[in-house]
């Protein structure tokens, strides 16, 4: 089915989603399956960057992911610890894969790495024991370190390092208009969280423990400029706090968490955050 027809079919099905179920057959099921397959191969993306730097969200692909939950029934998934099974609607991306398929895909997935079907993983990516949710896009030479989560439909660029325990938020629950986007050459420090459609622009470095949501103020310490929802390119960002407003009794109010841009990336920063090509051979 051509992409234009695919989009129209999925949009119409989503508008009538109360009528879609595991018993649904025909054009709607075929359209959703085709969309998931295209996402899985990386031939389409939930969000794409234009030449201007703006990101455009393909809402119909997000709708296809959501419709798949109504179309697919629960089933046992083998491979659990001690011979146990899981119980879910979404199969593993790696279901049925053998050595040749992994070699063709060209990325590493160590034991404990979980990737759901419809997520795309680029060549030379390293997946430590981590979780990549459906509809996500992880581009070439990126490292997803241990216990990190890449949420549904999140877009991760090339040569990104996602450190241990990082949380990259998804779009499905709570439902978000746009996915989290981490552009090329970013470094996300351990236990940092980026959620609610925040965009981290190219080359930015988030220190350990930075939490960013749609309403988090990102303060440039040098200029005083405040950014919300977007980290400027090549920024070095650390956790911070803004002084609180006085309370009714005149006492100082509680401080509000924020993020602080302390500098722009320099050679010293690059030496600490550069990727190791040896790990991607």
From Swiss-Prot:
SUPFAM superfamilies recorded: Trimeric LpxA-like enzymes
Cellular component terms per the entry's GO annotation: cytoplasm
Keyword set, alphabetical order: Acyltransferase, Amino-acid biosynthesis, Cytoplasm, Diaminopimelate biosynthesis, Lysine biosynthesis, Repeat, Transferase
Disulfide feature: none
Subcellular location: Cytoplasm
Top class in the EC scheme: transferase
GO-annotated molecular function: 2,3,4,5-tetrahydropyridine-2,6-dicarboxylate N-succinyltransferase activity
InterPro entries: DapD_Trfase_Hexpep_rpt_fam, Hexapep, THP_succinylTrfase_dom1, THP_succinylTrfase_N_sf, Trans_hexapeptide_repeat, Trimer_LpxA-like_sf
Sites where the protein binds substrate: 108, 145
Reaction(s) catalysed by this chain's protein: (S)-2,3,4,5-tetrahydrodipicolinate + succinyl-CoA + H2O = (S)-2-succinylamino-6-oxoheptanedioate + CoA
Alphabetical GO biological process terms: diaminopimelate biosynthetic process; lysine biosynthetic process via diaminopimelate
Acyltransferase recorded as keyword: yes
Pathway annotation from the record: Amino-acid biosynthesis; L-lysine biosynthesis via DAP pathway; LL-2,6-diaminopimelate from (S)-tetrahydrodipicolinate (succinylase route): step 1/3
TM helices/strands, residue ranges: none
EC number(s) recorded for this UniProt protein: 2.3.1.117
Domain of life: Bacteria
UniProt record similarity statement: Belongs to the transferase hexapeptide repeat family.
Complexes and interactors: Homotrimer.
Listed name of the protein: 2,3,4,5-tetrahydropyridine-2,6-dicarboxylate N-succinyltransferase
Gene name tied to this protein: dapD
């Amino acid at each position: 089915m051509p992409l234009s027809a695919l989009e129209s079919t999925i949009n119409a099905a989503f508008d009538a989603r109360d009528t879609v179920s595991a018993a649904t057959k025909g054009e709607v099921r075929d359209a959703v399956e085709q969309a998931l397959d295209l996402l899985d191969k990386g031939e389409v993306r939930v969000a794409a960057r234009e030449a201007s730097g703006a990101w455009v969200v393909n809402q119909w692909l997000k709708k296809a992911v959501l419709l798949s939950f109504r179309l697919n029934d629960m089933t046992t998934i083998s491979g659990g610890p001690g011979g146990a099974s899981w119980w879910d609607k979404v199969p593993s991306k790696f279901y049925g894969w053998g050595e040749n398929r992994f070699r063709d895909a060209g990325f590493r997935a160590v034991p404990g790495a979980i990737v759901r079907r419809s997520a795309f993983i680029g060549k030379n990516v390293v997946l430590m024991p981590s979780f990549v949710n459906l509809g996500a896009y992880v581009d070439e030479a990126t490292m997803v370190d241990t216990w990190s989560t890449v949420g549904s439909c999140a877009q991760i660029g090339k040569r990104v390092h996602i450190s241990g325990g990082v949380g990259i938020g998804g779009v499905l629950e709570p439902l978000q208009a746009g996915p989290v986007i981490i552009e090329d050459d970013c470094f996300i420090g351990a236990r940092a969280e980026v959620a609610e459609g925040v965009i981290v622009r190219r080359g930015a470095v988030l220190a350990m423990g930075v939490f960013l949501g749609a309403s988090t103020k990102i303060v440039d310490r040098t200029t005083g400029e405040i950014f919300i929802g977007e980290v400027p390119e090549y920024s070095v960002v650390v956790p911070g706090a803004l002084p609180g407003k006085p309370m009714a009794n005149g006492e100082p109010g509680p401080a509000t968490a924020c993020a602080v841009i302390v500098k722009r990336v320099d050679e010293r920063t690059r030496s600490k955050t550069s990727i190791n090509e040896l790990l991607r051979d």
